[in-house]
Swiss-Prot record:
Its cofactor is a divalent metal cation. Residues 6-149 form the Nudix hydrolase domain. Accelerates the degradation of transcripts by removing pyrophosphate from the 5'-end of triphosphorylated RNA, leading to a more labile monophosphorylated state that can stimulate subsequent ribonuclease cleavage. Coiled coil: none annotated. InterPro entries: Nudix_hydrolase, NUDIX_hydrolase-like_dom_sf, NUDIX_hydrolase_CS, NUDIX_hydrolase_dom, RppH. Its EC number is 3.6.1.-. This is RNA pyrophosphohydrolase. Keywords: Hydrolase. It comes from the Bacteria. The keyword Calcium does not apply.
Length: 229
């Protein structure tokens, strides 16, 4: 479904955790990282499409997230001809998107990349809100920057915990009880029976791990075949 200018209506999702870190998904069988997104079907509202895509790509249901904000207007990007299927060239120009800022209310194990039989991602991670966008395909970077900038003022504010104090208190408690400090295990954070697509990776405690800079992730390869981006 295209508008009169050749743009396909679409939604994009910026998903936050409780630390205001952002979900990044690695497109299946590639080294490309991106936010969840997808087209709006005929008869759908942007919000309905957003919740459908959220479940299809990330496995989350409406009660598991909070809608914080959305962009006021459509954000557009044009897709270069080499990325467009031949039968769509001449009338398909690109995407126009409404972006939503969401916050995860549940747990990391609620995320499920295999909620459908056609997964979009085979790995995921949390990262800081502001990171270089080098791993995003070039023609999408402008829209990512506009969406992140417009929605940044709606980021939830939260008190910074004094992790040093908490750590010190825990150490003294162990010392006073005569017990050695045990390494923290995160195995309980993985939901039993949770499945990922072949070759997927999962950070068992992404809420508490220190994310590596996004620019350290693999760079985006040039697709081998045109795609309807």
């Amino acid at each position: 479904m295209l508008d009169r200018d050749g743009f396909r209506p679409n939604v994009g999702i910026i998903l936050l955790n409780q630390r205001n870190q952002v979900f990044w998904g690695k497109r299946i069988r590639t080294h490309s990282w991106q936010f969840p997104q997808g087209g709006i079907d005929r008869g759908e509202t942007p919000e309905q499409a957003m919740f459908r895509e959220l479940h299809e790509e990330v496995g989350l249901l409406p009660p598991q997230v909070r809608v914080i904000a959305r962009t006021r207007d459509w954000l557009r990007y044009e897709v270069p001809d080499r990325f467009i299927r031949r039968d769509a060239r001449g009338h398909y120009k690109g995407q126009k998107q409404i972006w939503y800022l969401l916050q995860l209310l549940g747990h990391d194990w609620d995320l499920n990349l295999r909620a459908t039989n056609h997964p979009e991602f085979d790995a995921w991670r949390w990262n800081d809100y502001w990171v270089p966008l080098d791993v995003v395909v070039e023609f999408k970077r402008g829209v990512y920057e506009m969406a992140l900038t417009e929605l940044a003022r709606f980021l939830p504010r939260h008190e910074q915990r004094n992790r040093y104090l908490r750590s010190g208190m825990r150490t003294r408690e162990h010392e006073s009880s005569g017990q050695a400090s045990l390494p923290r295990t995160s195995s309980l954070l993985v939901k039993p029976g949770m499945e990922l697509p072949p070759g997927a990776s999962f950070d068992p405690d992404p809420q508490n791990s220190v994310p590596a800079p996004l620019e350290a992730l693999p760079t985006l390869p040039v697709p081998k075949k045109p795609l309807d981006a």
